[in-house]
Amino acid sequence: MVKLTSIAAGVAAIAAGVAAAPATTTLSPSDERVNLVELGVYVSDIRAHLAQYYLFQAAHPSETYPVEIAEAVFNYGDFTTMLTGIPAEQVTRVITGVPWYSTRLRPAISSALSKDGIYTIAN
């Protein structure tokens, strides 16, 4: 015989799981919310692999980055507000312009978007 407390605990656990699941949203890849997730991953990657980014910059001096990204890398507080307003094309250019985009950044961005319940559609 199953106790009512067991059933109640099971229902509560299911309800908590449903409440904790993020809502899903489908957005354009150029949506600012998508860009902010991408830039958050990018800033974290720069922090984790700073020497690699310095070497890339030295080898490609014509590659420029928005000043907001540099400020966010070295500001260890909440940097997301610094990154608003960067045009989507510029976000795409800087993120996809590094050789490790497909092996390290793209999977991390996909994971972060999915974790936030965001899916993108083609423009």
UniProtKB/Swiss-Prot annotation:
| InterPro entries in the cross-refs | SRP1_TIP1 (IPR000992), Yeast_SRP1/TIP1_CWP (IPR050788)
Q: Name a GO CC annotation attached to this entry.
A: fungal-type cell wall
- Record key words, sorted: Signal
> Which range is the signal sequence, renumbered to this chain?
1-20
**Quick one: a GO biological-process term for this protein?**
fungal-type cell wall organization
The domain of life is: Eukaryota
Q: Which residue windows are transmembrane per the record? A: none
Query: What Gene Ontology molecular-function terms does this entry list?
Result: structural constituent of cell wall
Q: Of which family is this protein a member?
A: Belongs to the SRP1/TIP1 family. Seripauperin subfamily.
The protein's name is Seripauperin-16
Chain's gene name: PAU16
